[in-house]
């Protein structure tokens, strides 16, 4: 017992962890109504990471070399489950910043040597509205994955910054997502 903390009055349960056991509680974004708490099992979290890691096409992950930059919060399924478990299962690295800040984006992407970046729809117009940055083309990013970018912004972003925006859509409640990762992409 650490100094200053009282000893527990009850013994911890000792048993093997099962795939069906609750691993986390995440709240939905409220897209289909009020946000709701989702009890997510270990099976769910591993399946989501495996799904993302195995998509291939425009979002093929190599083993042991990818650096996934994710500025999204860890209370969201994107950062805490999809990219985290994908990185873990493929022996890669997740670069987790404290929060998205447009003024730090290119410096963090460049300095972290990110090969994959995650975004939400609001990120793209913010980056496009910024003056040219020395690192906006001097990076190692192969693709970005996220949701909510208006179709007309894709071409401008991809031309200016040199990598594709891959749209994904999913629901925290059901561990299912769809992604436009095969050519020809329908934006």
Model-derived features with residue positions:
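Conserved S/T- and glycine-rich ATP-binding loop of Class I adenylate-forming
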Residues: 22, 28-31, 68, 74, ...
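Generic structural marker for isolated residues within well-ordered, non-membrane alpha-helices
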Residues: 25, 83, 124, 154
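Gly/Ser/Thr-rich phosphate-binding loop
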Residues: 89, 106, 111-119, 128-187
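A secondary-structure boundary/capping signal
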Residues: 41, 71-73, 98, 120
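Short beta->alpha linker loops
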Residues: 44, 100-101, 122, 149
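Conserved adenylate-forming
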Residues: 9-20, 25-70, 90-92
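Conserved AMP-binding/adenylation subdomain of ANL enzymes
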Residues: 46-67, 75-116, 126, 130
């Amino acid at each position: 017992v650490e100094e200053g903390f009282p000893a527990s009055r009850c013994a911890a349960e000792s048993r093997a962890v099962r795939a069906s056991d609750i691993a986390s509680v995440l709240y939905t974004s409220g897209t289909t109504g009020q946000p709701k708490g989702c009890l997510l099992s270990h099976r769910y979290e591993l399946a989501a990471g495996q799904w993302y890691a195995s998509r291939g096409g425009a979002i093929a992950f190599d083993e042991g070399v990818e650096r996934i930059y994710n500025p999204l919060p860890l209370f969201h399924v994107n950062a805490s489950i999809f990219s985290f478990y994908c990185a873990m299962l493929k022996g890669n690295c997740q670069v987790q910043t404290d929060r998205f800040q447009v003024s730090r984006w290119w410096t963090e992407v460049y300095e972290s040597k990110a090969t994959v970046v995650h975004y939400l729809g609001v990120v793209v117009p913010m980056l496009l509205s910024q003056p040219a940055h020395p690192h906006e083309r001097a990076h190692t990013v192969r693709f970005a994955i996220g949701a909510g970018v208006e179709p007309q912004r894709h071409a401008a972003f991809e031309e200016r910054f040199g990598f594709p925006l891959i749209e994904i859509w999913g629901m925290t409640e059901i561990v299912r997502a769809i992604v436009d990762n095969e050519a020809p992409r329908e934006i």
